[in-house]
Design a protein with these regions (language model features):
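N-terminal beta-loop-helix "entrance" segment that forms/cooperates
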Residues: 47-65
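Internal anion-binding site segments
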Residues: 2-8, 197-309
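Short amphipathic alpha-helix with an adjacent loop that forms part of the alpha/beta core around
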Residues: 77-86
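Short, high-confidence coil segments that cap the C-terminus of an alpha-helix
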Residues: 12, 86-87
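Short acidic-hydrophobic, aromatic-tinged amphipathic segments that line or gate anion-handling sites
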Residues: 70-75
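N-terminal Rossmann-like dinucleotide-binding module
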Residues: 2-51
Length: 309
C-alpha cells in the first residue's frame, strides 16, 4: 500500500479540485461561495459529442472557466503546480479516473463518495443501491488512496430509499449532503479517517442492456429499474421507453409477464410477480407522453405482450 501524504491539521482554505460531470459542479460552486481558495481544477479531456462530433468541454471545465479558476487535464501538471505553490488538499468529486500513487504521496486528497462504504465501491453506487432494493444509502467523505474507494471515512450522512425514490432524487440529496459535510470538514478541520468495516460490494457501471425490462421479474424489481432512468421495453418491434410507472400489485402470478391490460385510463402490465401501471412513456422517435395518450394512439391489444420483439 502506498504511503499517503498526511492530511492537513486545522481549517483547510486552499484546495485543488478534481471532477468532471455535472453532478460535481455544485460542489465546486459551493467551495468558491464558501470562500475556499480553489487554486486549480483538473478534469477529464474534452470529448467529441453530437452529430458534428465537435470537441466539448466537461461541465466542470465550463464551470471553472466561468469562475475564473485555472483548469487543466493533467494530474501531473497539478502535482507540479502543488510543488511550486502548495495547496492544503485535493478534493475529488466524480473525477472519472484513479489518482496515481506517486501523486497521493505528495498531495493528500479526499473524495465525496455517494454510498455507505464499503457497500458499493465503484462507478455506479447510486444505481446499484437502487437496483438492489437497499432501504437506505448515504454519502461519505473519504481519504483517497491507491485502491478503488478503499480509504478511511471522515464523515457520513444517510438517507432512506423509499418506494418512489428515483436515482435523480438520491443523486440530488447525496450531493447536497456531501457538500455540506465537505464544507464542515474544511472549516472545522478534517476528522481522523476511520478504516472501512464490513464486506465490500462493487458498483459496476450500468451496461445498456441492463436497462431492458425483463417482465418475468417482479413488479418491485421492474419499478426500481424504471426509477433508475432509461428503462425500456419493446412494442411491435419498436423501442418503448418507460419513464414513470407505479406498482399496483405485488403478489399475483396469474398475469402473463408483459401482458397488457387497458382499463379506462390505466395501462397495466403484468410481471412475473405482480403488475405495474404505466404513467409516462416514450415511443421510438417520439416525445415523452402520458401512457394513456400512447395507448389511445397505439391501441395495444389484450393479446399483445410488451418486450416480445
Amino acid at each position: 500500500m502506498t504511503s499517503l501524504a498526511t492530511l492537513p491539521v486545522g481549517p483547510v482554505r486552499r484546495v485543488a479540485f478534481l471532477g468532471t460531470p455535472a453532478l460535481a459542479v455544485p460542489v465546486l460552486e459551493a467551495l468558491v461561495h464558501d470562500g475556499v481558495d480553489v487554486a486549480h481544477v483538473v478534469t477529464r479531456a474534452d470529448k467529441r459529442r453530437g452529430r458534428g462530433s465537435e470537441l466539448s468541454p466537461s461541465p466542470v471545465k465550463e464551470c471553472a472557466r466561468r469562475l475564473g479558476i485555472p483548469v487543466g487535464h493533467s494530474v501531473e501538471e497539478l502535482l507540479d503546480l502543488h510543488r511550486r505553490a502548495p495547496v492544503d488538499l485535493g478534493v475529488v468529486v466524480a473525477y472519472g479516473a484513479l489518482v496515481k500513487p506517486h501523486v497521493l504521496r505528495e498531495l493528500p486528497m479526499v473524495n465525496i463518495h455517494v454510498s455507505l462504504l464499503p457497500r458499493w465501491r465503484g462507478a455506479a453506487p447510486i444505481e446499484r443501491a437502487l437496483l438492489a432494493g437497499d432501504s437506505e444509502t448515504g454519502v461519505c467523505i473519504m481519504q483517497v488512496e491507491e485502491g478503488l474507494d478503499t480509504g478511511g471515512v471522515l464523515a457520513t450522512a444517510r438517507m432512506p430509499i423509499g418506494r418512489d425514490t428515483t436515482a435523480d432524487d438520491i443523486r440530488s440529496r447525496l450531493i447536497a449532503d456531501g457538500t455540506t459535510l465537505l464544507l464542515r470538514q474544511l472549516r472545522d478541520g478534517l476528522s481522523v479517517p476511520v478504516p472501512q468495516e464490513g464486506e465490500p460490494t462493487h458498483a459496476a457501471k450500468i451496461e445498456p442492456d441492463e436497462l431492458r425490462i425483463d417482465w418475468s421479474r417482479s413488479a418491485e424489481e421492474i419499478s426500481r429499474l424504471v426509477r433508475l432512468g432509461g428503462a425500456f421495453t419493446t412494442h411491435r418491434g419498436g423501442r418503448l421507453k418507460v419513464h414513470r410507472a407505479e406498482v399496483i400489485d405485488t403478489e399475483s402470478t396469474h398475469r402473463g409477464p408483459g401482458s397488457v391490460r387497458v382499463a379506462r385510463d390505466s395501462i397495466e402490465i403484468g410481471a412475473g410477480i405482480g403488475a405495474i401501471r404505466l404513467i409516462e412513456v416514450q415511443p421510438e422517435n417520439k416525445a415523452r407522453m402520458n401512457a394513456s395518450a400512447w395507448a389511445n394512439g397505439a391501441k395495444p391489444g389484450s393479446d399483445e405482450v410488451l418486450g416480445g420483439g
